[in-house]
């Protein structure tokens, strides 16, 4: 809406308000629909004709748009009437929230979308994306090396296997939030559970259901005792990490061991299952040996950086982490340094064994990832390590985690 001297708005109250014309500014609060701040010179409006400032009698001024006919949520609007010598201008500012008309079907669809969005946020999207990319790239590499073994049923089995792995991932993320509610009210008050967007009962359902479904899928796929054991190990690791009386997360060493078991188990199980599905025997290829070593050392950075944004809550509830002991800045420098050493080792590997890897891809990709890490660490330092910036930095480490598996496809 643009305020002007002529308006077709219908008014819910008396449209004429008596305003004293003196040397004082007058603020009249009203309601209006959305408009950016506008300044209307009253000399161009028939409703605010200029008068001599010596005239101190009350004039009747027609204020427009007190109650406009619009489908919107109404927000306060301020009118400021200036004195005549200053041009009798009116400054209006307004904010609204759209409220479009919704049919029953549209409203139900919106509710479903909102629920799915909250569920997706609850299972920590950055970890889920990392697991999906990891699984896809490990399986994709085997297909690239053995294209003659491709078949549609094989892809279907691979998708079911990925869903099983995601089940353990969702369980680990969910069980941690359920038992960290008090801490998260301080560290992450915007999470779906502590913010009240989902109930505790719903959280338990979203946590246990994926784990059970994943276990059923593992059995249905006839994955064998090894993969079934690895799945159970992932569930066990997520449990002892978060659930009392274990709460391994309260000690930085045991927390690292849990995270290492989860990531190492994921890496090995997907590779083993991929080769088994293709009818190939398990073998430690140079590329898989490299990605296993790289991800193992990268887990050090993930484990040390995961609590950067949680320092305040962890200290209050007596949770000892590397971040609470050493501080956000020192942990960032430590984690960044370890990961940079990892990239240097990757570049050195490409130089030392040029026949085992595609050296050009190894060199260029890891150099780019290393410089991007340095840039993000500098950006974090400039923010003085605020919780929001620390959270973004940790999620960026997960992006680097995923990027390494993409590189693995082509080395």
UniProtKB/Swiss-Prot annotation:
Pathway as given in its UniProt record: Secondary metabolite biosynthesis
Principal subcellular localisation of the protein: plastid
UniProt KW keywords: Chloroplast, Membrane, Plastid, Transferase, Transit peptide, Transmembrane, Transmembrane helix
GO molecular function terms noted in the UniProt entry: prenyltransferase activity
First-level EC class: transferase
Subcellular compartments: Plastid; Plastid, Chloroplast membrane
Cofactor note: Cannot be substituted by Mn(2+) or Zn(2+).
Activity-pH dependence: Optimum pH is 7.0.
Gene3D superfamilies associated with the record: UbiA prenyltransferase
The reaction(s) this protein catalyses: a 2-acylphloroglucinol + dimethylallyl diphosphate = a 2-acyl-4-prenylphloroglucinol + diphosphate
Membrane topology: Multi-pass membrane protein
Family to which the UniProt record says this protein belongs: Belongs to the UbiA prenyltransferase family.
Function: Involved in the biosynthesis of prenylated phenolics natural products which contribute to the bitter taste of beer and display broad biological activities. Catalyzes the first prenylation step in the beta-bitter acid pathway. Abble to transfer dimethylallyl diphosphate (DMAPP) or geranyl diphosphate (GPP) to phlorisovalerophenone (PIVP), phlorisobutrylphenone (PIMP) and naringenin chalcone. Can also use phlorisobutyrophenone (PIBP) and phlormethylbutanophenone (PMBP) as substrates, but not 6'-O-methylated chalcone or naringenin.
The protein's name in its UniProt record: 2-acylphloroglucinol 4-prenyltransferase, chloroplastic
